[in-house]
Design a protein with these regions (language model features):
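Conserved mixed alpha/beta catalytic, RNA-binding, or beta-rich assembly cores of soluble enzyme
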Residues: 25, 32, 37-201, 205
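Extended, intrinsically disordered, low-complexity segments
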Residues: 185-234
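Short Cys/His-rich zinc-binding micro-motifs
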Residues: 16-17
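Iron-sulfur cluster-binding cysteine motifs and their immediate structural context
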Residues: 1-13, 22-39
Length: 234
């Protein structure tokens, strides 16, 4: 469990679970079930107004354009000036062609532009799996290559299965606009998060742990920064 939400001889800790679903097929006895946890659109607008983030990520799926429109309308109600609206979507589990996925993204693009939002396309190669092994990195790179000529305007970011091996899979002339480390980053810093909790505090309030966490995160990011500085794409 990338969120460390399942301990030996205990149930799933709902406070830590973020719904990746990796445990569902992994349990041989089928003891783990899933349930929805949803905020209505009014609650979403209220939450965003309170937190006032610089950007928001919205996960979407084929055939969910109306639900997407409703969420975007709720974000607009919050009146928070977002710098970017990240849209996360991929092919896995949807039996789509890249062309069909691009049509879905164009639909989302039209919705975003109606509300004056600037999109960032987060191409989910193999969702929430970067900590599983080196091979998961391939799906994100392959999806980026297939969607690059088809996607609507906006930066295309690698996601879903990204890890320390992702950068080695790119050609010398291939430059995605960004990379998101989810499962891999969580695996790297989770021991520090748990240690901070054992100390009765949060990681960001524990100076030594915070410094160690930043060093671990920088180890993931630094190769991309070095690569970026050698090009005109950044």
């Amino acid at each position: 469990c990338p969120a460390d939400a399942i301990a030996f001889n205990t149930a799933v800790d709902a406070r830590r679970c973020y719904g990746c679903g990796r445990c569902l097929p992994a349990c041989p006895h089928g003891y783990i079930s899933e349930r929805d946890h949803r905020l209505d659109n009014v609650a979403i607008a209220t939450l965003i107004a309170e937190v006032r983030p610089d950007a928001v990520e919205v996960h979407t799926a084929p055939g969910r354009s109306e639900a997407f429109d409703a969420v975007i309308a709720a974000l607009a109600v919050s009146r928070v000036p977002l710098q970017r609206l990240a849209v996360s979507c991929g092919l896995e589990g949807h039996a789509l062609t890249p062309q069909a996925l691009s049509c879905e993204l164009w639909s989302r693009y039209n919705s975003l532009r109606r509300h004056g939002l600037r999109p960032l396309w987060q191409l989910d190669g193999r969702p929430m799996s970067g900590d599983v092994g080196a091979g998961t990195a391939r799906a994100a790179v392959q999806l980026w290559r297939r969607l690059s000529p088809l996607a609507p305007p906006g930066p295309l970011q690698l996601a879903g299965g990204t890890n320390g091996h992702t950068i080695d899979l790119l050609g010398v002339d291939e430059y995605p606009a960004g990379v998101a480390f989810g499962g891999m980053a969580r695996r790297v810093v989770m021991p520090l998060i748990l240690e901070a909790q054992a100390r009765g505090t949060a990681l960001r309030h524990w100076p030594e742990g915070w410094r160690r966490g930043l060093a671990l995160a920088e180890a993931l990011v630094r190769p991309w920064q070095a690569r970026c500085l050698t090009t005109d794409f950044c």
